[in-house]
A protein has these predicted regions:
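Secondary-structure transition/capping residues
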Residues: 24, 31, 54-61, 104
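Short, surface-exposed, charged/polar-biased interaction segments
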Residues: 34-41, 45, 64, 71, ...
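A short, surface-exposed loop/turn module that caps and links secondary-structure elements
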Residues: 45-75
Length: 110
């Protein structure tokens, strides 16, 4: 019997990804809103397959983001960091960021 996988995404993460669509479009990273939506949909698709992706332990100094993390290289220039907690087959996605954020220095420890 296959156990059910439950993936819960914190509201702060969904809000961030919703805003990301608008940001990518208005800052002209994408010429069409649909392309920005597709970009974010690909991130969601990656997250929903978290159970099949090798994850790493988060360094102690940033475990407030989550005890584990995975990385997703969506483009040549952008690496996404997805932080989460896990118990059995339940995953709580707590934080998402990328290497372009203003204070990305903490990501260098990963």
């Amino acid at each position: 019997m296959v156990e059910k996988i439950e993936i819960i995404i914190a509201k702060s993460v969904t809000n961030y990804l919703d805003e990301l669509i608008y940001t990518l479009y208005t800052k002209e990273y994408f010429g069409y809103i649909e392309d920005a939506e597709n970009y974010v949909t690909a991130i969601y698709n990656f997250v929903y397959n978290i159970h099949s992706i090798q994850h790493k332990n988060t360094p102690q100094k940033i475990t407030h983001f989550g005890n584990f993390y995975i990385t997703y290289k969506r483009t040549k220039r952008t690496m996404w960091y997805i932080f989460f907690d896990k118990k059995d087959n339940r995953y709580l996605i707590k934080h998402i960021t990328n290497n372009h954020v203003e204070n990305a220095t903490f990501l260098h420890s990963l």
